[in-house]
Amino acid sequence: MLLDGAQGQSYQQYHKPEKEEEKKPFVLPEKNQNMRRIYAYLTKTRGIDRDVLSVFVHAKLIYEDAKYHNAVFVGTDADGNPCHAHKRGTSTTESYKGNVESSNPKYSFHWLGQSDTLYVFEAPIDLLSFITLYQKDWELHSYVALCGTTDQPILQLLEDEPRIKKVALCLDRDAAGIKAGARIRQTLLERGCQEVFPLFPTRKDWNE
């Protein structure tokens, strides 16, 4: 029956919205019993210095997963709790990379030193390659790999570590890297960061 003489009008039936799927908890991939494959891949194929790699391994920031033998780069919060992980395949015939499900983008793979400078990279291997090239007193400085396009890891580190006053944007030397660097620089300056400057590799990225 139509009310108030309203004829020819249609009314949409109400549907209760479906319950949003609950976010799965963050879980690190199971560790392999040894790290032979990631050491071979990162040192021989990608040219990372073995001693530099070992520092990160001993800090439990890099390990090899048991199922696929990926290199896993762990990101921790201010209390040292793992809450982000980036996986990189170690096969020389297939390329794979991606973040573990439910990783918190604010806490990607990073290293904290005591100086006032933070070096920012697109990927963990770029970060390790830069340190391999410039090893002198590297542990004094801070480094972060964005593991994506977000600037959240930088903003979180600046909040957690007020001693950081300078940010070097060591992104890829390509159109995307230059554009992202300009965007991030503007954001950081607006947030009160004292000094933000680009630091480009000689070639496209720090591992070439």
Cite the ranges covered by each PLM segment:
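Residue-level signal for functionally critical sites in structured catalytic/ligand-binding pockets
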Residues: 42-45, 86-90, 122, 126-129, ...
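Short, structured coil/loop segments at alpha-helix boundaries
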Residues: 2-4, 32-39, 49-50, 65-66, ...
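Replication-associated primase and helicase/ATPase modules
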Residues: 1-33, 37-44, 168, 182-208
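Basic, glycine-enriched DNA-binding surface that flanks or lies within the catalytic cores of DNA
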Residues: 9, 13-103, 109
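TOPRIM fold recognition
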Residues: 116, 132-208
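Phosphate-handling DNA/RNA-contact segment within nucleic-acid enzymes
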Residues: 65-160
